[in-house]
């Protein structure tokens, strides 16, 4: 009988691996896995490219003055109250506190030992996609799913807590976004999608084992800008489940609403994912980055210092309210935002103030109806749980009536840049410079999650840092003292902060290279869609090609 799936030997022809596969990873990166990667690439890459081209066309329209809005052609989906998402999946019913972080072994162990509901293992914003990081990350997740995880790091032993009766956080994997490629893996001479690669390797090796452990193949999907991008994922999910013999709907995907176009298409995104939908998440920093990026040609949409653009800002609050209303209407989770603070061990007063801000922020979210929130550090878990346990008595708030009547959210509500007391300060410019250069420097050293000024920063905050300065310079914004933010003024601040950063920097640092990337963006000389694509080639280690047939 014929099969829609070609033989493994045929599928791996044309596959080339341009990075080393260590012995401890060969059971994962085998012919069958790479054949699956190649099959998805050949079946779906053309559509990915079409969708990326659509992003460019949509940006051209925005540059011409056609601002983001609700789509008239999908109004019937938004207005149809009869459809909902699927029943909640095992391990994804109560998600009140989710910890996030990269996939290095220590992080995976610490996250799974935390008193949280889920752990989002990240191949995206908090991981530099160096080949070594990606391979080791897949090995770590393979072992995590099988509860076979330990490590000795700097003489200290780390073990997964397998105490009987203990809840081990549900594992959710975040693959890279549609815009990122994986240059270490070629299929028919073309680099594969980073997201498809991350998804395929994990899914093929661990989907069935995840089910055996009582959860399933669960994912977080980042940076989508159109509901058809969600449809592409849905089609990949259906094909993948058929490929390994799983029932459709076994996969579940939570979507980060972290772009301005996506906030106008939340109903449609849930609808496109259908039986695979597991809710929507508030991706604060990338959302602010997308706001600036999408509206960058328009001087009417200038934002103040990033420290002032909190979730209490009117346009950010509208975004959360609409997300909660939309998800609960469709019977899926409303997933709150990130608490990025890390403990300030040497200053009790500052640490207490930081934790009070976390409490206030999470109280706002749970009161608005959010079913969960993210933390970047285990020390914040008790703080967050105290708020959610007090104000959310059940496993979630999906079926509860809202505490306040929902007032329809308009295009103006979502786009208005008004922030009470808004101002741009020299301190804010300097902070953006320090964060941007420091993050890029760490990324170039293969570190994608970086503590800076007691906040855990990832690529999203670096994006905000560079785009804010670009916006201020490009449109001649003024500081609170009336000083026009010119290229010359920013150049002076750049030089001063760069000198401070390099004065006591450790040998082997990458500050010079980071400055070379950051400065042209901040000075308004160029604008890159993503800083991660701009600097990706610096962390690739392209080596001699290993044909798929020889794996």
From Swiss-Prot:
**EC number(s) on record?**
2.3.3.9
Q: Which organism is it from?
A: Candida tropicalis
Q: Where in the cell is it found?
A: Glyoxysome
**Top-level taxonomic group:** Eukaryota
**Sequence similarity:** Belongs to the malate synthase family.
Its main localization is other
Is Transferase set as a keyword in this record? yes
Disulfide bridge map? none
- Catalytic reaction annotation: glyoxylate + acetyl-CoA + H2O = (S)-malate + CoA + H(+)
Q: What is this protein called?
A: Malate synthase, glyoxysomal
Molecular function, one GO term: malate synthase activity
**Which residue positions are annotated as catalytic?**
174 (proton acceptor), 458 (proton donor)
């Amino acid at each position: 009988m014929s099969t829609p799936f070609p033989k493994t030997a045929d599928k791996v022809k044309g596959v080339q691996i341009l990075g080393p596969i260590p012995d401890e990873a060969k059971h994962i990166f085998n012919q069958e896995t790479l054949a699956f990667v190649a099959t998805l690439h050949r079946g779906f890459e053309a559509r990915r490219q079409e969708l990326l081209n659509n992003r460019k066309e949509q940006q051209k329209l925005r540059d011409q003055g056609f601002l983001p809005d609700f789509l008239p052609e999908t109004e019937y989906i938004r207005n149809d109250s009869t459809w909902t998402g699927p029943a909640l999946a095992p391990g994804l019913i109560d998600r009140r506190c989710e910890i996030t972080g990269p996939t290095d072994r220590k992080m995976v162990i610490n996250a799974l030992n935390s008193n949280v509901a889920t752990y989002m293992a990240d191949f995206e914003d908090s991981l530099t996609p160096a080949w070594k990081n990606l391979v080791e990350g897949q090995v770590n997740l393979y072992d995590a799913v099988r509860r076979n995880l330990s490590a000795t790091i700097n003489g200290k032993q780390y073990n997964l807590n397998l105490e009987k009766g203990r809840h081990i956080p549900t594992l959710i994997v975040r693959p890279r976004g549609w815009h990122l490629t994986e240059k270490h893996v070629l299929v028919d001479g073309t680099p594969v999608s980073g997201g498809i690669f991350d998804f395929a390797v994990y899914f093929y090796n661990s989907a069935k084992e995840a089910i055996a452990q009582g959860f399933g193949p669960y994912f977080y999907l980042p940076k989508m800008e159109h509901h058809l991008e969600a449809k592409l994922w849905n089609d990949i999910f259906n094909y993948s489940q058929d490929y390994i013999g799983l029932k459709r709907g076994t996969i579940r995907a939570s979507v980060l609403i972290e772009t301005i176009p996506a906030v106008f298409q939340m109903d449609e995104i849930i609808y496109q994912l259908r039986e695979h939908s597991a809710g929507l998440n508030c991706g604060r920093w990338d959302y602010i980055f997308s706001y600036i990026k999408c509206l960058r040609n328009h001087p009417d949409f200038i934002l103040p210092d990033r420290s002032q653009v909190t979730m209490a800002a009117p346009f950010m609050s509208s975004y959360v309210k609409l997300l909660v209303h939309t998800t609960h209407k469709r019977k899926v989770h409303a997933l709150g935002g990130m608490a990025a603070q890390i403990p300030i061990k040497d200053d009790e007063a500052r640490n207490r103030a930081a934790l009070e801000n976390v409490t206030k922020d999470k109280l706002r979210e749970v009161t608005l109806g959010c079913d969960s929130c993210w933390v970047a550090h285990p020390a914040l878990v008790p703080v967050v749980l105290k708020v959610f346990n007090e104000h959310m008595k059940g496993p979630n708030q999906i079926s509860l009536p809202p505490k306040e009547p929902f007032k329809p959210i308009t295009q103006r509500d979502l786009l208005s840049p008004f922030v009470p007391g808004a101002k741009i300060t020299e301190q804010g410019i300097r902070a953006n410079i320090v964060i941007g250069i420091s993050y890029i420097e760490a990324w170039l050293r293969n570190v994608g999650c970086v503590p800076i000024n007691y906040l855990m920063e990832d690529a999203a905050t670096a994006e905000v840092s560079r785009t804010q300065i670009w916006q201020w310079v490009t449109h001649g914004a003024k500081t609170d003292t009336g000083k026009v933010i010119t290229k010359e003024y920013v150049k002076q601040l750049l030089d001063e902060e760069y000198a401070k950063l390099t004065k006591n920097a450790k040998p082997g640092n990458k500050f010079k290279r980071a400055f070379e990337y950051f400065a042209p963006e901040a000075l308004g000389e160029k604008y890159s869609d993503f800083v991660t694509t701009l600097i990706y080639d610096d962390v690739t280690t392209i080596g001699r090609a290993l044909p798929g047939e020889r794996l």
